[in-house]
């Protein structure tokens, strides 16, 4: 987990790369995870990321459902240096 966070928040000269790194997709099997849990995950992910980097604008958050699976797709715009 720490390695993942180091890659996500590593110094980068490209704002586009940072935005791409922060596009998070969590997939789960709907039979074991409720919509309320997905909302909680979304809120907590945004909270954790905002502790480490400054967010610019409004994050785009989508819950995508396909068959038995759902995905939480988060696109977070970061403030430039």
UniProtKB/Swiss-Prot annotation:
Q: Please provide the record's keywords in A-Z order.
A: Cell cycle, Cell division
GO biological process: one example: regulation of division septum assembly
- Which top-rank group of organisms is this from? Bacteria
Q: Which Pfam families match?
A: MinE
- Alphabetized HAMAP family for the sequence: MinE
- Hey, which family's this protein in? Belongs to the MinE family.
Q: Tell me the function of this protein.
A: Prevents the cell division inhibition by proteins MinC and MinD at internal division sites while permitting inhibition at polar sites. This ensures cell division at the proper site by restricting the formation of a division septum at the midpoint of the long axis of the cell.
Record's protein name: Cell division topological specificity factor 1
